[in-house]
């Protein structure tokens, strides 16, 4: 695997790290922990966690993905993407629309050449 010197995390509360607290009450989620380990491999390592709790997939794409796309072209980048869970919780959830948005977002990320790690909503 090539040296990955950049990590961009996109998504909602799962990626933001909500409910994963330090003793002082501040958040430090899985993405922060992964970034800590990745930074040990490269002194020029860069990390951006753009995830925000409560965001719908359309908001993740508009507010996070579109901002991050230019940065994905600049380095050996790992991108994580988790979105759609908050859509599922809505009364008028439209799975086909969410899936289409998800597919388009994945295609945009893959077109940059970045390495992509996907997370999905757990089946219940």
Task: Indicate residue ranges for each PLM-predicted region.
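Serine-esterase "nucleophile elbow" of acetyl-processing enzymes
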Residues: 1-51, 69-73
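Alpha-helical cap/lid subdomain in secreted, periplasmic
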Residues: 2, 63-124
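Cell-envelope and extracellular/periplasmic
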Residues: 14, 51-55, 83-84, 88
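Short, solvent-exposed loop/turn segments at secondary-structure boundaries
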Residues: 19-24, 59-60, 90-95
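A structural signal for well-ordered alpha-helical scaffolds and beta->alpha junctions
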Residues: 27-31, 61, 102
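Structural motif
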Residues: 55-63
């Amino acid at each position: 695997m090539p040296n990955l010197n950049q990590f961009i995390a996109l998504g909602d509360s799962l990626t933001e790290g909500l409910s994963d607290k330090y003793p002082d009450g501040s958040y430090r989620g899985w993405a922060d922990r992964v970034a800590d380990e990745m930074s040990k491999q490269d002194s020029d390592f860069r990390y951006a966690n753009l995830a925000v709790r409560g965001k719908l997939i359309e908001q993740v794409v508009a507010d996070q993905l579109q901002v991050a796309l230019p940065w994905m072209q600049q380095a050996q980048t790992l991108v994580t993407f988790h979105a759609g869970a908050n859509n599922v919780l809505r009364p008028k959830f439209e799975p086909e629309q969410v899936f289409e948005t998800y597919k388009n977002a994945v295609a945009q990320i893959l077109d940059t050449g970045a390495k992509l790690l996907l997370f999905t909503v757990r089946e219940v």
